[in-house]
Protein backbone atom coordinates (compact mmCIF):
# COMPACT_ATOMS: atom_id res chain seq x y z
CA UNK A 1 0.00 0.00 0.00
CA UNK A 2 0.80 3.65 -0.20
CA UNK A 3 0.51 6.15 2.62
CA UNK A 4 0.19 9.91 2.39
CA UNK A 5 2.19 10.19 5.61
CA UNK A 6 5.06 7.97 4.38
CA UNK A 7 4.94 8.87 0.68
CA UNK A 8 7.91 11.28 0.79
CA UNK A 9 10.12 8.56 2.23
CA UNK A 10 8.79 5.92 -0.16
CA UNK A 11 9.32 8.14 -3.21
CA UNK A 12 12.78 9.20 -2.01
CA UNK A 13 13.82 5.59 -1.38
CA UNK A 14 12.91 4.72 -4.96
CA UNK A 15 14.90 7.71 -6.25
CA UNK A 16 17.86 6.69 -4.05
CA UNK A 17 17.70 3.27 -5.73
CA UNK A 18 17.89 4.92 -9.17
CA UNK A 19 14.18 4.44 -9.82
CA UNK A 20 12.97 8.02 -10.17
CA UNK A 21 10.75 7.09 -13.14
CA UNK A 22 8.98 4.47 -11.00
CA UNK A 23 8.60 6.99 -8.18
CA UNK A 24 6.99 9.48 -10.58
CA UNK A 25 4.67 6.76 -11.90
CA UNK A 26 3.55 5.94 -8.35
CA UNK A 27 3.07 9.62 -7.59
CA UNK A 28 0.91 10.07 -10.72
CA UNK A 29 -1.19 6.99 -9.95
CA UNK A 30 -1.75 7.71 -6.27
CA UNK A 31 -2.11 11.47 -6.15
CA UNK A 32 -3.68 11.46 -9.63
CA UNK A 33 -6.33 9.14 -8.18
CA UNK A 34 -7.29 11.83 -5.70
CA UNK A 35 -7.57 14.33 -8.55
CA UNK A 36 -9.80 11.91 -10.50
CA UNK A 37 -12.07 11.76 -7.47
CA UNK A 38 -12.48 15.54 -7.62
CA UNK A 39 -9.78 16.62 -5.17
CA UNK A 40 -8.52 20.18 -5.36
CA UNK A 41 -6.07 19.55 -2.50
CA UNK A 42 -4.38 16.37 -1.28
CA UNK A 43 -6.02 14.34 1.46
CA UNK A 44 -5.08 12.99 4.86
CA UNK A 45 -5.71 9.42 3.72
CA UNK A 46 -6.44 7.72 0.40
CA UNK A 47 -6.66 4.24 -1.07
CA UNK A 48 -6.81 3.60 -4.84
CA UNK A 49 -9.50 0.95 -4.19
CA UNK A 50 -11.86 3.73 -3.11
CA UNK A 51 -12.15 4.79 -6.76
CA UNK A 52 -13.79 1.52 -7.88
CA UNK A 53 -17.31 2.41 -6.75
CA UNK A 54 -16.80 5.80 -5.19
CA UNK A 55 -18.57 8.94 -6.27
CA UNK A 56 -16.56 12.03 -7.13
CA UNK A 57 -16.59 14.64 -4.38
CA UNK A 58 -18.79 16.99 -6.37
CA UNK A 59 -21.50 14.43 -7.24
CA UNK A 60 -24.56 13.11 -5.44
CA UNK A 61 -24.90 9.68 -7.02
CA UNK A 62 -25.95 6.42 -5.40
CA UNK A 63 -22.30 5.44 -5.01
CA UNK A 64 -20.59 5.43 -1.66
CA UNK A 65 -19.08 8.65 -0.34
CA UNK A 66 -15.27 8.52 -0.68
CA UNK A 67 -14.93 11.37 1.78
CA UNK A 68 -17.38 10.26 4.47
CA UNK A 69 -17.20 6.47 4.27
CA UNK A 70 -13.43 5.96 4.43
CA UNK A 71 -10.34 6.90 6.36
CA UNK A 72 -8.00 4.73 8.38
CA UNK A 73 -6.89 7.69 10.51
CA UNK A 74 -10.31 9.09 11.42
CA UNK A 75 -13.70 7.97 12.63
CA UNK A 76 -15.68 6.53 9.73
CA UNK A 77 -18.57 8.82 8.92
CA UNK A 78 -16.92 11.84 10.51
CA UNK A 79 -14.89 12.62 7.41
CA UNK A 80 -11.14 12.78 7.11
CA UNK A 81 -9.26 15.92 6.14
CA UNK A 82 -9.28 16.81 2.45
CA UNK A 83 -6.36 19.22 2.85
CA UNK A 84 -3.70 17.71 5.06
CA UNK A 85 0.02 18.27 5.60
CA UNK A 86 0.61 14.51 5.43
CA UNK A 87 0.01 14.79 1.69
CA UNK A 88 2.59 17.50 1.05
CA UNK A 89 5.20 14.96 -0.09
CA UNK A 90 4.87 15.69 -3.83
CA UNK A 91 5.99 19.30 -3.38
CA UNK A 92 9.17 18.37 -1.51
CA UNK A 93 9.92 15.32 -3.70
CA UNK A 94 9.48 17.22 -6.97
CA UNK A 95 11.63 20.15 -5.78
CA UNK A 96 14.38 18.08 -4.19
CA UNK A 97 14.59 15.09 -6.52
CA UNK A 98 13.08 15.94 -9.91
CA UNK A 99 14.35 19.55 -10.06
CA UNK A 100 17.28 18.50 -7.89
CA UNK A 101 17.32 21.55 -5.63
CA UNK A 102 19.41 20.68 -2.58
CA UNK A 103 20.52 22.97 0.22
CA UNK A 104 24.27 22.52 0.60
CA UNK A 105 24.66 24.61 3.74
CA UNK A 106 22.36 26.19 6.32
CA UNK A 107 20.84 29.52 5.37
CA UNK A 108 20.56 28.78 1.63
CA UNK A 109 23.88 30.45 0.72
CA UNK A 110 24.90 27.39 -1.36
CA UNK A 111 22.40 25.38 -3.34
CA UNK A 112 23.03 22.40 -5.59
CA UNK A 113 20.98 21.59 -8.67
CA UNK A 114 21.11 17.86 -9.47
CA UNK A 115 17.96 17.03 -11.47
CA UNK A 116 16.60 13.49 -11.81
CA UNK A 117 13.94 13.69 -14.52
CA UNK A 118 13.12 9.98 -14.55
CA UNK A 119 10.74 9.48 -17.47
CA UNK A 120 10.02 13.20 -17.84
CA UNK A 121 11.34 15.21 -20.78
CA UNK A 122 11.37 18.46 -18.81
CA UNK A 123 10.51 20.03 -15.47
CA UNK A 124 10.50 23.54 -14.10
CA UNK A 125 9.76 25.15 -10.79
CA UNK A 126 10.67 27.72 -8.17
CA UNK A 127 12.15 27.40 -4.70
CA UNK A 128 11.78 30.19 -2.10
CA UNK A 129 14.82 31.23 -0.06
CA UNK A 130 15.46 34.05 2.42
CA UNK A 131 17.23 35.93 -0.42
CA UNK A 132 14.52 35.50 -3.04
CA UNK A 133 13.32 32.84 -5.42
CA UNK A 134 15.51 30.30 -7.22
CA UNK A 135 13.95 29.34 -10.58
CA UNK A 136 15.00 26.12 -12.33
CA UNK A 137 14.18 24.75 -15.81
CA UNK A 138 15.48 21.30 -16.77
CA UNK A 139 15.21 19.59 -20.15
CA UNK A 140 16.58 16.30 -21.49
CA UNK A 141 18.92 16.73 -24.44
CA UNK A 142 19.57 14.36 -27.33
CA UNK A 143 22.88 13.18 -25.86
CA UNK A 144 21.29 11.96 -22.61
CA UNK A 145 22.33 14.94 -20.55
CA UNK A 146 20.07 17.40 -18.82
CA UNK A 147 20.13 21.04 -19.82
CA UNK A 148 19.52 23.34 -16.85
CA UNK A 149 18.64 27.02 -16.81
CA UNK A 150 18.40 28.76 -13.47
CA UNK A 151 18.02 32.19 -11.95
CA UNK A 152 19.11 32.82 -8.39
CA UNK A 153 19.63 35.84 -6.17
CA UNK A 154 23.24 37.03 -6.19
CA UNK A 155 23.72 36.03 -2.53
CA UNK A 156 23.34 32.34 -3.48
CA UNK A 157 26.11 30.21 -4.96
CA UNK A 158 24.77 27.51 -7.31
CA UNK A 159 26.52 24.20 -7.93
CA UNK A 160 25.48 21.68 -10.60
CA UNK A 161 26.29 18.01 -10.94
CA UNK A 162 27.92 16.00 -13.71
CA UNK A 163 25.71 15.19 -16.68
CA UNK A 164 24.20 18.66 -16.45
CA UNK A 165 24.86 21.25 -19.13
CA UNK A 166 24.25 24.94 -18.56
Give residue ranges: language-model regions.
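Well-ordered alpha-helical segments within folded domains of soluble proteins
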Residues: 2-16, 86-96
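Non-catalytic C-terminal accessory modules of carbohydrate-active enzymes
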Residues: 21-166
Amino acid sequence: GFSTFMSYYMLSALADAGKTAEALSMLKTYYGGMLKAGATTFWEDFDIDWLKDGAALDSLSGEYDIHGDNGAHCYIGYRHSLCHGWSSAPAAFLAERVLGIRLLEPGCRRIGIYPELGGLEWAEGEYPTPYGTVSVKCRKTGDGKISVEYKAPEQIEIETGSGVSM
